[in-house]
Curated annotation (Swiss-Prot):
Residues 431-778 form a coiled coil. It is found in: Nucleus. This is Coiled-coil domain-containing protein 110. Its main location: nucleus. GO terms for cellular component: cytoskeleton; nucleus. It comes from Macaca fascicularis (Crab-eating macaque). Keywords: Coiled coil, Nucleus. It comes from the Eukaryota.
Amino acid sequence: MSPEKQPQEEDEVDSVLLSASKILNSSEGVKESGCSGTEYGCIAESENQIQPQSALKVLQHQLESFQALRMQTLQNVSMVQSEISEILNKSIIEVENPQFGSEKNLAFGARIEKDLPTENQEGNLSMEKSRHFKDSKTLHSVEEKLSGDSVNSLSQNINVPSQMHFEDTLTLRTSTDNLSSNIIIHPSENSDILKNYNNFYHFLPTAPQNVMSQADTVILDKSKITVPFLKHGFCENLDDICHSIEQMKEELQKSHDREVALANELQTLKTDPNVQSNDKYDLSPIHQEKMNFIKEENMDGNLNEDIKSKRISELEALVNKLLPFRETVSKFHVNFCRKCKKLSKSEIHRGKRNEKNNKEIPITGKNITDLKFHSRVPRYTLSFLDQTKHEMKDKERQPFLVKQGSIIFENEKTSKVNSVTEQCVAKIQYLQNYLKESVQIQKKVTELENENLNLKSKMKPLIFTTQSLIQKVETYEKQLKNLVEEKSTIQSKLSKTEEDSKECLKELKKIIGKYNVLQGQNKTLEEKNIQLSLEKQQMMEAFDQLKSKEHKTQSDMAIVNNENNLMSIEMEAMKTNILLIQDEKEMLEKKTHQLLKEKSSLENELKENQLEVMQLKEKERLAKTEQETLLQIIETVKDEKLNLETTLQESAAARQIMEREIENIQTYQSTAEENFLQEIKNAKSEASIYKNSLSEIGKECEMLSKMVMETKTDNQILKEELKKHSQENVKFENSISRLTEDKILLENYVRSIENERDTLEFEMRNLQREYLNLSDKICSQHNDPSKSTYISRREKFHFDNYIHEDISSPRSRPLASDLKGYLKVKDRTLKHH
């Protein structure tokens, strides 16, 4: 990874952290507003439309503020590197020129002894340092306490540079933490900030000019404002975000389980063949009003769930952006360690040269044990070695003050110089061992980087799958729009069919009244048939009498032959009339039977129509609930798509801004390096201050090792989250397949409803025609009772065919199966609820 991309990614991390915290606060506000009821649904929608604009403005301000912080961190890193190199150079110069260093340290140590013994000072510092790094959670509180103590101790002991140095670092760290949490710094204010940091130390009691200069205080100020406080806030924000996302996911999981249960009910209802044959009925207006009322309540209840799902999708997108940005912090520290490694290599070469020049120094067993001791002893124990060094320098200073030129004192001086050089060599070897440990840490960090690259390669196919899913969602949205239009047309048609059914009910009532009239007419016809039968009996009796008269009048046959012929003709006519009367009687009996059958069939049809109407109402209710659930799912998918697009746009804008900032940073670094080189030349005389800064750098390296451990844990978390995201993608694909199946089932259901509506209209027309034919026939019979005896053969044939068609019509058959299917559907819905 190139060093130019590091500041870009750091700024992106900072900006995304603050935006995530803002969205967390807004999501908590949405949770509280969601419980207030359905009256504030419209207000929540308007607020959600305003929030994205305000969020963009907030993100812009946050980007500007964190650009300034990034500039400061880069300057601090460069200062720390320059201090390390200067300290190492000074240690090597002291080894090469031991007399110069000893004289300087003698003059410096004498001033320290005048005010306060060094043993107490260094002991207090070592205890404070060990206390300072025991617990990372209580770091800020301990620093504030120590800074308060440092002000008191400085007022008492003005000329103590080591104690003043340590306390200045503590006060600076507390001040930088407060500044980073409370103040928004713009890039144009960098010079003012540095001036404020310099002026901050004017409140403390100033040391003499021989001990510490103002340029040195500026260097200390800049070197202490380091990156680790940013990392600490980064981890805390991520933990808060993950915790809130888990809570919101649990709420969404509950709603998702409800939707899955409804989808299972839909599939069971639609796969049942008995239910599919019952989709022939319409809703009444009363039930339709109830359904609309329930639908409005469900929409008001689902507004809050939609808002929560939007917030969760935004947070997930931000977390997905944050996860790769965690790696940038670790890589930043890795580059810092690499630079330290380069410095260590240069120091190793210089050490070899010094060993060649210092072959005269004897290496005894005691020196070897001292070197081992220095390699094992922790960093805060080096202060004790510094104390002994100052004591030896004070003893060396006495011959110069007394001006005794004896050989004994010169030998003591050379022996003490040799001991000082041995201690310097031990310290250099301790630094080399420490750099080796940093190299091992760098290897571990490179391994972690390789793991991160593998994870990124695994993320690429997931990105392609999300893009394909987005395309599928767009196609499904188009199909759903078409289905919504079809639904509106079908609803208009259903309203028309409801009106037609009302008219049919009115006509059926009229038919029942006319049927009652026909029953009265049938009774009168039966009475007439009884009278005709009596007349027939009388005619038979008369015919018998005539036969008896024929026997009596055989004698008169010759006279009455003509009359007999006439009578025979009349008898034949009477016989034909009798046959016609018998046929008419049979026809009337058949008609009465048919009318009774029609009555029973009409009553059965009325019951069937009522049952069908109830079934159609329930089926429409179920279809509406299914469509509502599908619309809700589609809205959530749309919201996720919009959130992804907004995050992509924000990332593109952030990249452009970062490229511009990199150019400004490069120019600023070139000017800053020139200024810092001049200040470092003035600071070479202050070796004790740099030794203290070496101890602090060691502590910072320990912090880096802790950061490496944190990166390991972060990598494990990233792996777990990868698994979770892959599982979620599988769930989304399954849900999309279910939606496609539900869509196909809904289309088939709509087609079946249209076919049933057409069949109902056709049957109603047939009923109207039959009713008109029956009414015409009844009117003709009622108006011409005398002519009713003479019914033509053609009318008889038409009436018989009508009866046959009525018996074989499909409306009289599926009653039992429809009732069974209706009862099954009702039982299932009760069980699910």
